[in-house]
Amino acid sequence: LSKEYQELNLKGGRAYIRSDSFEKIKSLDAIIFDCDGVLIDARRSYDEAIRRSVQHIFTTLTHIPLPLSTIPKEAIYNLRLSGGFNFDWDTTYVIALVLFTNLPKPFQEAFSEAAKQIDREEALERLAEASSKLNNKLPKDYFEKNGKMLKEVLIRFTQSNPEDREAAERLILKSAEREGCVEHLKAFIEFLAYNSEAPRNMISIIFDTYFYGPKLFKELYGFESRLRVRKGLIEKEKLIVTEETLKALKEMLGEGRLGLATGRSSLATKKTLGDLLSYFNSQGMVFLEDLKYKMGGSESLIKPYVKPQPYSLLEAAAGIGDVNSVLYVGNSAEDYLMTKNANSVKRIFLFAGCYAIHNTRSKIIELFKGAEAALIIPTVNDLPKVLGYVRGVRGG
């Protein structure tokens, strides 16, 4: 692969520039960014919210604290590598189903029985009611003794690379059928009400309470969460992108040439990017989570718009205006798949992949090379230097 890529040593690591992309990179007239893992380090917010949500559901149901270590980050990253898990609600949901099917049969039976007697609309009321019927249904040392087994099951399942939430759900149902517990799993699926709107949808309510915290949650939903959380995990986010980088890119490309195509909500993006948002063209910003809330949180309605479908990238490019060569900067499989899908509609997109905040750097670099990314860079802050180099300005 070395001939296909020219390498450039930078302070933060090595950049790879695809040899046949030089001319296209030189003529770039816009750059559109993904947020998480590119502009914002969201590992301590989104990843943590997935784990806390699953922990909350199972600790409440079983009356036994589920250690966070039972839900390995590796399982989350494995699902994301497939390219079909752009919404962390999906990841949370799948992990919850896998855990449920691996709990002892007697507990699953007790849950099914309890669930039949519950008809509460509101997710957290349902959870409380189920919990009240399930005390002492699981040995008190269950998670202590079986935590390692559950963790391994999650890693194994996610390594099987289900392509999206629906594929994962089918696999889990099939395996539950083999184990003879499919009816219990169906009761659990119904209990989570994942295809319903808030406040019925348990995953969205619990996840968003942990992620946003009470104040932003209320701003988003218009009602208060019944789950008491002091501060949202969004407060733990850190910026990756610097103002210096955005300034340099604006100078290179001109005013209004930077856009966003992200799965985030505008609320979460504003909260963390703050004033830096002013560097982006307001017409060229697409927030898929906003669209999801507008559609009442409905999974089936949002599916045609979600990455790797090209909607957000095409829409952001159209918002920027007259563009002939657009670089999309992402950090995952779904980002490059989206670029590829957008090119089948309008052949104007190049992909740049950022790898430095990945836990498996070499794996992701290989993934991007295999996807023929135009650029592979440590972080977004290396972009001005690499673009300068390609344009023949070998910045010091």
Q: What are the functions of these language-model segments?
A:
Residues F287, A374-L383:
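Short acidic-hydrophobic, aromatic-tinged amphipathic segments that line or gate anion-handling sites
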Residues F22, F58-I64, N102-P104, L249-E251, ...:
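Alpha-helix termini
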Residues E4-E74, D90-Y93:
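Active-site neighborhood of HAD-like aspartate-dependent phosphohydrolases
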Residues R18-F22, S27, I32, K133-G147, ...:
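Short, acidic loop-to-helix structural element flanking the phosphoryl-transfer center
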Residues I50-L185:
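Conserved phosphoryl-transfer catalytic core
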Residues F223-K250, R257-L327, A333-S344:
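Substrate-recognition "cap/lid" segment bordering the active-site pocket of phosphatases
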Residues L383-R394:
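Short amphipathic alpha-helix with an adjacent loop that forms part of the alpha/beta core around
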Residues G274, Y328-P378:
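Acidic, Mg2+-coordinating phosphoryl-transfer loop and its flanking beta/alpha structural elements
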